[in-house]
Amino acid sequence: MIQTETRLKVADNSGAREILTIKVLGGSGRKFANIGDVIVASVKQATPGGAVKKGDVVKAVIVRTKSGARRADGSYIKFDENAAVIIREDKTPRGTRIFGPVARELREGGFMKIVSLAPEVL
């Protein structure tokens, strides 16, 4: 469960290393985001020469959470870290590579480009 002020690792090569959640999108007064949800975030750490700079306000999709997600078959999936991928308005990633595994829930959210770039889908 990701909420406002949560810091997330960035799992792509867009140039950002860490982002801070500003707002969870999807409804008035929504408090938490899970895997596959879109957030508005600020870049807190960035690599030199990257496409995004420190202080940029970006949209990102959650790809891994420590709290995990419950699936329809009753199983749960949890990860070691909270991570997100920075996206454009059309749900495509800003970077060209995805690092680490991503959850299968992204497929239902329409993030097929992220699923196809990921090295592993769990």
UniProtKB/Swiss-Prot annotation:
Transmembrane segments: none annotated. SMART domains: Ribosomal_L14 (SM01374). The keyword Ribonucleoprotein applies. GO terms for molecular function: large ribosomal subunit rRNA binding; structural constituent of ribosome. InterPro entries: Ribosomal_uL14, Ribosomal_uL14_bac-type, Ribosomal_uL14_CS, Ribosomal_uL14_sf. GO terms for biological process: translation. One of its GO terms (cellular component) is cytosolic large ribosomal subunit. The keyword Phosphoprotein does not apply. It comes from the Bacteria. Keywords: Ribonucleoprotein, Ribosomal protein, RNA-binding, rRNA-binding. Pfam families: Ribosomal_L14. HAMAP family: Ribosomal_uL14 (MF_01367). Belongs to the universal ribosomal protein uL14 family. Binds to 23S rRNA. Forms part of two intersubunit bridges in the 70S ribosome. NCBIfam families: rplN_bact. Part of the 50S ribosomal subunit. Forms a cluster with proteins L3 and L19. In the 70S ribosome, L14 and L19 interact and together make contacts with the 16S rRNA in bridges B5 and B8. Can interact with ribosomal silencing factor RsfS, which may inhibit ribosomal subunit association. This is Large ribosomal subunit protein uL14. The lineage of its organism: Bacteria, Bacillati, Bacillota, Bacilli, Lactobacillales. The gene is rplN.
